[in-house]
């Protein structure tokens, strides 16, 4: 079997409760939602997938990948195996040294999920008042990527 892309949830929890997400519903994730995949288990899964033609790993699922404080280490594992590391995130934690570590680890694609075009619509959809912070994080990350050549 040929598997060129894998979506691997390294973190089950989320720091948002977006209107459109099943995780935000009562009982949406149950008790296991706080679990994180260990680095060892992740590397074992990647080792197995590489032999099937793996080219891209999406480090997300229903959980928020940036809640995993070792996200940069997961990216490094993907890169060591010759694949690309993609992520979708609400962007709330992508700032400062954490953001730089994730970028410098070799992230190939990082999408900020911003539902709403101003603080009011963002709040209505994402149940968060962090619109300005997330926009600032996005702009800072863009500058860092451009300035560092990452």
Kindly label every feature range from the protein language model.
Residues 1-109, 120, 124-125, 129-132, ...:
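Conserved alpha-helical substructure of the radical SAM core
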Residues 144-150:
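Short, intrinsically disordered, charge-balanced linker/junction segments flanking boundaries
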């Amino acid at each position: 079997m040929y598997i060129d892309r894998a979506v691997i949830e390294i973190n089950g929890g989320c720091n948002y409760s977006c209107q459109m997400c099943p995780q935000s519903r009562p009982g949406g994730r149950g008790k296991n939602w706080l679990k994180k995949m260990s680095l060892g288990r992740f590397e074992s899964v990647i080792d197995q997938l590489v032999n099937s033609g793996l080219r891209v790993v999406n480090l997300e699922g229903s959980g928020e990948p940036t809640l995993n404080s070792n996200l940069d280490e997961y990216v490094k594992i993907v890169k060591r195996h010759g694949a690309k590391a993609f992520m979708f995130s609400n962007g709330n934690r992508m700032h400062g040294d954490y953001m730089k570590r994730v970028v410098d680890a070799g992230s190939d694609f990082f999408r900020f999920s911003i539902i709403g075009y101003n603080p009011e619509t963002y709040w209505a959809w994402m149940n968060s008042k962090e619109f300005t912070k997330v926009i600032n994080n996005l702009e800072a990350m863009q500058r860092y990527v451009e300035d560092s050549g990452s």
